Amino acid sequence: LSFGNEVHCTCPLDKGDGSVVRSIDPYGHLLTTTYGDDAVWQLPEMDFSQTHWYGDGSQRDCVTTIVNIHRHHLERYRKPFLLGEFGIDWRTSDLTYDPKGNALHWHNGIWASLMSGGMGTACVWYWDNYIDRLNLWHHFRPVAEFVRLVGKAWLQNWRPLKHTDPVADVLSHEQQFGDFVFTPTLGWQRPTGDTFVLHRNGKVESDGETSVFLFSPSKPDLYRPPKFIVDFPQDGVMAIQVGTVSSGSVLIVRIDGKEVWRQGLPEGAERKDEQGRTYREGSYREKRWVEQWRKWDYVYDREFVVPVPKGKHTIEVDNQGADWCTVTQIRFSPYRDLKFPEVDIVGIQTETAALIWVHNQQSNFQNEREREQGIRGELKPIKGLRFEVLGLKDGKYSIVLWDTWKGAITAKWQAQCRQGKLLLRLPDLQRDFALWITSR
C-alpha cells in the first residue's frame, strides 16, 4: 500500500497514516510511499523504500542509474527497496522508442534491479500501450524461472558483489584506448557529489553522484557543477551529450581552472512564433512549448566536443545560463584502456554464494535503434571475458550460466576458490547472461 504517488510526503503525515492503517488492516499490507526522504524512510511504519526513475530519451541505457539507485537506498535505509516505476522517457511511452519491441531498456532494467538486491524487478509503467500492445509478456518468464531456480536461497543475507576488474581478449598486444563514457545517475535533485576521478580501467571514484540536470545558479539549492580528474594518454576530446535545454543555458568548460570553451544554447537570434511567443533559433532538433511554465524547451540530443590535451587535468563542466539543461553522458576519448571491456558486472553475494548479471554495455536500446537505422554495425561479442569474485569461502563451487532471454541453463561447471578468490572464465558475451554460484 502506497500513501502517495510522486508526492513528496512529510514525515508527520506518513507516521500518522502508518499507525492508522496498522490498526485497521487485518491483512498486514506492506506500507510505502513515493516520494520519501530520510525522515520518511527511517520510520518503522515504512516497510520498504521506493522511488520512480525515468530518463528523457537521450540516455543510452539505464543500468548504471538503476544499480546506483538500489545501492543508495539499500545501504542508507537498511530495508527492502523497490523501483516502483521506470522508463525511457518521462514524457511518453517506451513504445515511442521501441516500436519493434526489442525490449532492451526494459530487459536491462529488470535484470539490473534484481541483481542489485531489489525486493523485486523494476516496474515498467506502460503496461497497456507497450507491454500488452507488443505482446512482450514472454520477457517475464526468463527472470521468473531464474528466481525459481535460486529458490529459498533468496532469503539469505546478501551484500553487494566484490570482484576484480574484468579483462578480455584484445586483438593487438599494443596498448589501445577507446571511449570512456561517464553517465550521470541522479534525477531532479541536488547532486550528492561533485568530484569524479576517471580511471582508465573504466571505474569512477567519487564523493557522491551527479544529476542528469546541469543546473545553473538560478537554482542555488540545486546548483553543484561536476568536475572530473582525468589523465589522458594522448591528446583527446571531451564530448558533452546535451539532451534538453530549458529556456536557455550557457555551457562552460574549464581545464585546470582556465576557461577553454563556452557555448550559449540556443545559439541563434530571438524570433516570435505565430502566437507571439518569443523563442531563439538554434541547432536544436525541435522546440517544445511548456504551457505550465510558459517557457520553451529546446531538444538537442547532440554532442558538443571540447579538445583536451594529453596528461593529468581537472575539468569542470558548468552552466551559467538562465536555466537548466540535461547532460545525459560525457564521453572522454581516447581514454579507456581497451583490455578492460565495456561490461557491467552487477551482483550480490554471501560467503558461500553469488548471483551475478554480466552485461555487454553495447547492448542498449539506443545502439539497437541505430542498428535498425543502418548507422551502426552489428553488435560484436566480447571474447575471453574473465574476472575474480572476492570474499567467498575457500572450496569448490558450482556455477550455472543462465540465458536471460530464453530462460534456460546453457552451461554448468565447477571451479575452486582459493584465498578468497574465485576465477570465472566466461563464454563469449553477446548481450547478457546471469550466473548462479553455490558452494558444494
Give names to the regions the model predicted.
Residues 382, 416-421:
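Short, solvent-exposed loop/turn segments in extracellular or other extracytoplasmic domains
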Residues 78, 90-91, 108-239, 246, ...:
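Aromatic- and carboxylate-lined catalytic core of secreted/periplasmic carbohydrate-active enzymes
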Residues 2-134, 138-139, 380-381:
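Extracellular glycoside hydrolase catalytic/binding regions
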Residues 299:
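Active-site-adjacent structural elements in folded domains
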Residues 49, 277-281:
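Short, surface-exposed amphipathic charged segments that create phosphate/polyanion-binding patches used
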Residues 52-54, 315, 416:
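Compositionally biased, intrinsically disordered low-complexity segments enriched
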Residues 37, 72, 101, 105, ...:
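Generic detector of short alpha-helix boundary/capping microenvironments
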